[in-house]
Amino acid sequence: MKKAYEIFRSELDSIKEAGTYKDERIITTPQKARIDTTVAKGVLNMCANNYLGLSNNPEVIAAAKASYDEWGFGLSSVRFICGTQQIHKQLERKIADFLGMDDCILYTSCFDANGGLFETLLGAEDAIISDELNHASIIDGVRLCKAKRFRYKNNNMEDLKAQLEAAKDCRIKVIATDGVFSMDGFIANLPAICDLADEYGALVMVDDSHAVGFIF
């Protein structure tokens, strides 16, 4: 055990020396445009996903407080045992209607959703054609499943077509893309992607974490 700790310590020291060690930013105020941290005051927050300001919206906060009185705090179970309450189904219905979809499922984070999606739906006879700049959660989710993997250049429809051609004999084909690529701000060419999906009989999976309610 001591040897393992020594290895971990050496690895951490190397990461720190390389300047790639990640320290948490500790925020001492609610999420908003300007925040305070333990090392600075009045910082302009440019890295949150609070695009619509819902985290500090008074109506949202009041509704959350009221929900505790009506529904209690916490699920007390996983969803499929006894952790699904009527309010969850109501929210799923509202989200599905907003997106124009048949149904939806709530996850605690998009990372969890992407991690569980592909393995659930796809097997060894299937294929995932993934944009090279997709979020790490999509990449990790793809790695967890047994489907064949194809990667196309970012937003490059000619390369996507070539990868679809290479995967044409697979049973189920899924094109996976970010809607808005979070690290670069590029917007996926969804009309062209969907046209190619129709041409090759593929499904389209879009991670729209950075677009829903904001870009459309």
Segments predicted by a language model, with ranges:
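Active-site phosphate-binding strand-loop segment of PLP-dependent enzymes
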Residues: 50, 150, 154-206
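N-terminal "arm"/small-domain region of PLP-dependent enzymes with the aminotransferase-like
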Residues: 6, 10, 14-73, 202
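Conserved Walker B
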Residues: 133, 180, 208-210
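Conserved N-terminal alpha-helix of the aminotransferase class I/II PLP-enzyme fold
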Residues: 62-110
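Active-site-proximal loop->helix
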Residues: 120, 138-145
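Conserved PLP-anchoring active-site segment centered on the Schiff-base-forming lysine
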Residues: 117-136
